[in-house]
Curated annotation (Swiss-Prot):
It comes from the Bacteria. GO terms for biological process: translation. The lineage of its organism: Bacteria, Pseudomonadati, Pseudomonadota, Betaproteobacteria, Burkholderiales. This is Small ribosomal subunit protein uS3. Part of the 30S ribosomal subunit. Forms a tight complex with proteins S10 and S14. Residues 39-107 form the KH type-2 domain. It comes from Bordetella pertussis (strain Tohama I / ATCC BAA-589 / NCTC 13251).
């Protein structure tokens, strides 16, 4: 079932944390949850061009603190901070409490699963071939340090009549391993043929229970790896001519000497 379950929900309280961090009683829980959903939908629409990877919402003591992880923080802040002030006013109107907004920069957007999925969906909406978009994203992620990546696209790919699913994988993506740091993201491409769904899994290495990465295991040196098969001319005589009980053929028998003339 590791292939089907949501990778983030599977690892909650083990190596991953919640994106909504607050406590509420039974009466207020539904209202606050609906507010979080509205805030996330608003930020997704408002900051569509800012490459937002994830949003964390915290509610300490009748306040709200929202952390936005973006690959383009300058777009969120705007000139002289005007855009972020307007954003803060809109969020306060949505939530009804004072809101503090923090902007965090994503250092490697090529290895962020949500940003990869959004990038592929934008390319599909511009009529770029889905295979080219998927393979280009995989190459960029592996080049910048990802240990494995898997991308899946579903829908009327290239405008075909019958919807299908195609996926590509490079490297390792251990979905059953709880300590594996799996980043997961989804997106939708609204094309003229219909909606195409994109799912992205990025494996960034193993993670300890406290959220820290373990020391990297030493990779085997080149001379310690399994040697390749030797060329035919460099093999020992036994391997070339065959031995009793082996798979090779036995030594070739010498041709009979020609009979002397006159007999």
């Amino acid at each position: 079932m590791g292939q089907k379950i949501h990778p983030t929900g599977f690892r909650l309280a083990v190596t991953r944390n919640w994106t909504s961090r607050w406590f509420a009683d039974d009466k207020a829980f539904g209202t606050m949850l609906a507010e979080d959903i509205r805030v996330r939908e608003y930020l997704k629409k408002k900051l569509k061009s800012a490459s937002v990877g994830r949003v964390i919402i915290e509610r300490p003591a009748k306040n709200a603190r929202i952390t936005v992880y973006s690959a383009r923080p300058g777009v969120v802040i705007g000139k002289r901070g005007e855009d972020i002030e307007n954003l803060k006013a809109d969020l306060q109107r949505l939530m009804g409490v004072p809101v503090h907004v923090n902007i965090e920069e994503i250092r490697k957007p090529e290895t962020d699963a949500q940003l990869i999925a959004d990038s592929i969906s934008q390319q599909l909406e511009k009529r770029i071939m889905f295979r080219r978009a998927m393979k280009r994203a995989m190459q960029n992620a592996m080049r910048l340090g990802a240990q494995g990546i898997k991308i899946m696209s579903s829908g009327r790919l290239n405008g075909i009549e019958i919807a299908r699913t195609e996926w590509y994988r490079e490297g390792r993506v251990p979905l059953h391993t709880l300590k594996a740091n799996i980043d997961y993201g989804t997106s939708e491409a609204h094309t003229t043929y219909g909606v195409i769904g994109i799912k992205v899994w990025v494996y960034k290495g193993d993670m300890l229970a406290n959220g820290e990465l373990p020391p990297e295991a030493a990779t085997p040196r080149e001379e310690e790896r399994r040697p390749r098969r030797a060329p035919r001319g460099d093999r020992p005589d036994g391997a070339r001519t065959g031995r009793p009980g082996g798979r090779g053929r036995g030594p070739r028998k010498a041709d009979a000497a020609p009979a002397p003339e006159g007999e």
